């Protein structure tokens, strides 16, 4: 059986988190983490990596539609660096960290939630988790496509 993968939609206030099923076919929303500080945030994420026995962390990379970096992209680079530093310092060297293009995932997530008739208040609570599901599923689909 394959190890799971964990997907992250990193924002300024929250991190949407999703995990793959053990076969690496589908993504399920796990939680929306309220951000409190980079050290605690990365610690909580690495706890989830251990708990779900993940071998890959997939981080949504937020670029502008034309493919250039945005202010948010720079924050993603910084987040990944801090996460990898924490992984090294805690002996988690075998975990792969990869980028997944996340342009428009939040827009798509909102559309899915609206179509499912989720109230505006509830959408706000689950939008980042849903975006993480889309990031994770996109990554899993790309792996399946590469195997063909």
Give short role names for the model-derived ranges.
Residues 3-5, 12-148:
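Phosphate- and other anionic-substrate recognition elements at nucleic-acid/protein interfaces
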């Amino acid at each position: 059986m394959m190890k799971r993968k964990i997907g992250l939609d990193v924002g300024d206030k929250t991190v949407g988190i999703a995990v793959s099923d053990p076969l690496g076919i589908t993504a399920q929303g796990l939680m929306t983490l309220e951000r409190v500080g980079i050290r605690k945030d990365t610690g909580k994420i690495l706890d989830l990596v251990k708990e779900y026995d993940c071998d890959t962390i997939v981080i949504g990379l937020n670029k502008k539609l034309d493919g250039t970096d945005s202010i948010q992209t720079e924050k993603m680079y910084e987040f990944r660096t801090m996460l990898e530093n924490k992984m090294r310092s805690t002996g988690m060297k075998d975990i792969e960290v990869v980028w997944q293009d996340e342009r428009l995932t939040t827009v798509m997530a909102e559309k899915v939630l609206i179509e499912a008739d989720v109230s505006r208040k509830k959408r706000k609570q689950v939008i980042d988790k849903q975006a993480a599901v889309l990031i994770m599923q996109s990554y899993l689909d790309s792996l399946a496509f590469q195997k063909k």
